[in-house]
Amino acid sequence: MSTVGFFQISQFTTPQIAIVIPARMDSQRLPNKALLPFHGLPMLEHVRRRGELNSHGIPVFVTSGDPQIITAVEDFGGLVSISKKDHLNGTSRVHEFSEQRVFTHFLILQGDEILVIPEQLDAIISSIVEQPEVDFWNMVTPLVEEDELVNQSVVKCLLGQNSEILSIFRKSPLCADVMVQMELVYKICGLFAISRQALALMSEMDSTPLEKCESIEQLKFIELGYRIKSITTPISYPSVNLPEDVENITDILLTDRRQIEVLKKIL
């Protein structure tokens, strides 16, 4: 696929990739969720170990300004980078990490994506290796339930024929029949990758009007006139955001065949 028209500020031809997990303790909707225990391990450690299952040997770092998180990661032998405690978002925290490292691309893995599977990470990493001139990748997945079209907690998007993300929103703007919309609208997953230059631009530029309106960070990139490449995954698992999510996640870990396989590898 031609990448003409994608964000072309990256000049790297041999990408040096890191998986980075930005983490903090003061989650508003579920305080201290980073260290919530699942099967004897903190949630963050589940995510870190899953990151290490990537087939490319890409290193996994946790970056945080919270001593509890730093200690927990170090106790398990993980790679950790100490950041300022106060950051506007995870991308800003990863930008601070990038300024201390020589990596060219950063796969940002959210610390609440406890059910991420290796093939999802590998799909993004492979795309970076094949097309390092692209500067922003975001994983997307088809919608499953019709109510996701209007559920504003589900961030959604429309794709172009070249896999470019055309627009991002919380409520579908389409007027077509629901079944047609279900075929056209995709869900944005909490897994994306970004080049060093694009990361700096995202972190240093002021928030844009649409970004503020929808509270969707990727909208800044599109508003500034740049483009995001989508990587489609056929299956998407929920993340941990609310107290009621904990029971659902626990059930999936015990009943989903692929999750059982991955869990055995990290415990």
Name the predicted role of every residue range.
Residues 64-65, 116, 194, 241:
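A conserved hydrophobic position in a structured secondary element of the catalytic/binding core
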Residues 182-267:
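Conserved alpha/beta core of the MobA/IspD/sugar-nucleotide pyrophosphorylase nucleotidyltransferase superfamily
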Residues 61, 67-126:
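Short phosphate-binding loop-to-helix
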Residues 57, 103, 131-134, 226:
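Short, high-confidence coil segments that cap the C-terminus of an alpha-helix
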Residues 19, 59-62, 106, 136-137, ...:
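Hydrophobic/aromatic residues located in beta-strands of well-ordered beta-sheets
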Residues 25, 84-90, 235-237:
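Short, acidic/turn-prone active-site loops that include or flank metal/cofactor-
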Residues 13-64:
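N-terminal glycine-rich phosphate-binding loop and ensuing alpha1 helix
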Residues 117-208:
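Conserved core of the sugar-phosphate nucleotidyltransferase
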